[in-house]
Regions:
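A general alpha-helical scaffold signature found inside nucleotide-binding enzyme cores
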Residues: 181, 366-373
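Short intrinsically disordered coil segments
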Residues: 40-43, 76-78, 370, 388-389
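Conserved, well-ordered alpha-helix/loop/beta-strand core segments that scaffold catalytic motifs
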Residues: 7-46, 50-53
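Short, gly/Ser/Thr-rich active-site loops of penicillin-recognizing serine hydrolases
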Residues: 275-282, 370-406
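Beta-lactam-recognizing serine transpeptidase/beta-lactamase-like catalytic domain environment
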Residues: 4, 11-13, 53-105, 109-363, ...
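Charged catalytic carboxylate motif
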Residues: 31, 35, 185, 293, ...
Length: 406
């Protein structure tokens, strides 16, 4: 035990010869992993990158981390207790265990659901945005941009009002018979896209997140609720929770135009085939044609082709690469979380990524530049000289988290 010979158990009656294990090859890109850990220094959050074509996890960063040498030697018990007591929770693998509001990255999944259910189409209807969604005394704020909007500019500008209207129309559509029936259809689409349940990655401890169903709302509201009651879920807030792995997987699904392979760390097992779940594609309940519309919106968020562009910085960091992206600014009791989901290049994509920086503010503040630098490293094998300077600056940025329990 712990490297010390203790003698034979039951005089060796149960002893068995050791069986050598199989050699494993991981899909982790060591340079990408090192860059991610560097960029998240002095911050709390996670980065997950996936190769869309294979589902291989290219990097999985959780910050803060800890020195594994603390877990050996005579002080290992004491060290483990100290790590458990640390308010920053370094033992928590936030990439698969952190359940966060996905914020506006979730609007892409909403768009696909509304398209599939024929609540919206690419060019119509257009929805108004007077600095937010306003209906029957309810206001959900939004930033300034053109109005009214159709789907692609709504994704590019991350318009809250557009997606509030979409959810309100779906949950009030008479074809479903009731909001309860509508949310059941809605949830089934979300689950098929990888939310609400564990994806089944080959690491222990994965959390499922949360996609609410009709019963979730029927109990507190005694069955009397509608789209306005739950409007915040339209923009990835309210009761919606997702892991960074699930958000990255959504990016990979969109990059593939409608399928994903369960994300996995192990690339190869010596003399063995990977389990079929890590080889065979899974198909959401969304028709392939609708993914192209969301791709256009995510591309417009970077290149500004529809006017305002929430991910414009990604284009500046990766000139010449057709990056597709979606920011998220997830509301929180303290400062908002900074989120980014994207993939590159637009056609024949090589990498899909999710970045989540707790209390980092707007998605463009931390999520977008970190995500773009990670894509630069992977696509080109190294950072450009300009991005190397930028990476050093970001690695030295410190987010102060105070003394609150985390």
């Amino acid at each position: 035990a712990h490297g010390r010979i203790q003698g034979h158990y039951m005089d060796g009656q149960l002893d068995r010869s050791s069986v050598p294990g199989k050699n494993l090859t991981l899909g982790i890109d060591i340079d990408l992993q090192m860059l991610g850990e560097r960029l998240l220094q002095h911050k709390i959050g996670a980065i997950v990158a996936i190769e869309p074509a294979t589902g291989e996890i290219l990097c999985m960063v959780s910050s803060p981390t800890f020195d594994p040498h603390l877990m050996i030697g005579r002080q290992r018990g004491k060290n483990h207790r100290l790590l458990q007591m640390d308010k920053r929770k370094p033992l928590l693998n936030r990439a698969i265990m952190g359940a966060y509001p996905p914020g506006s990255t979730f609007k892409t999944a909403q768009a696909l659901t509304f398209l599939q259910e024929e609540i919206i189409h690419e060019d119509y209807p257009t929805f108004p945005c007077a600095h937010g969604f306003n209906h029957k005394g309810l206001h959900v704020g939004c930033h300034g941009h053109g109005s009214p909007l159709s789907l692609i500019p709504a994704i590019a500008t991350s318009c809250n009002s557009y997606f509030c209207w979409g959810l309100y129309r779906m949950f009030g559509d008479k074809k479903y018979g009731s909001p309860q029936n509508a949310i059941t259809v809605w949830k089934d689409h979300m689950v098929s896209q990888g939310f609400g349940y564990r994806l089944g990655t080959d690491l222990p401890g994965e959390q499922r997140g949360l996609i609410p169903n009709a019963k979730f709302y029927d109990k507190p509201y005694r069955g009397s609720w509608n789209g306005l009651t739950v409007i915040s879920i339209s923009i990835g807030q309210g009761e919606i929770l997702a892991t960074p792995l699930q958000i990255a997987n959504l990016g990979a699904t969109i990059a593939n135009r409608g399928h994903f392979i369960t994300p996995h760390i192990v690339k190869e097992i010596e003399d063995n085939e990977l389990d079929s779940i890590y080889r065979n594609p899974r198909y959401p309940t969304i028709d392939r044609e609708y993914y192209e519309m969301v791709v256009k919106g995510m591309r417009a968020a970077v290149d500004g082709s529809t006017g305002s562009a929430t991910c414009r910085m990604a284009g500046a960091i990766l000139p010449g690469v057709e990056v597709c992206g979606k920011t998220g600014t997830a509301q929180n009791r303290g400062k908002d979380h900074s989120v980014f989901m994207g993939f590159a290049p637009m056609d024949n994509p090589k990498i899909a990524i999710a970045v989540y920086v707790e209390n980092g503010g707007f998605g463009a503040t931390y999520g977008v530049p970190i995500g773009a630098m990670m894509m630069d490293q992977y696509l080109h094998g190294k950072l450009s000289p300009e991005n190397e300077i930028r990476a050093e600056e970001f690695s030295n940025r410190v987010i102060l988290y105070g003394d609150e329990e985390r």
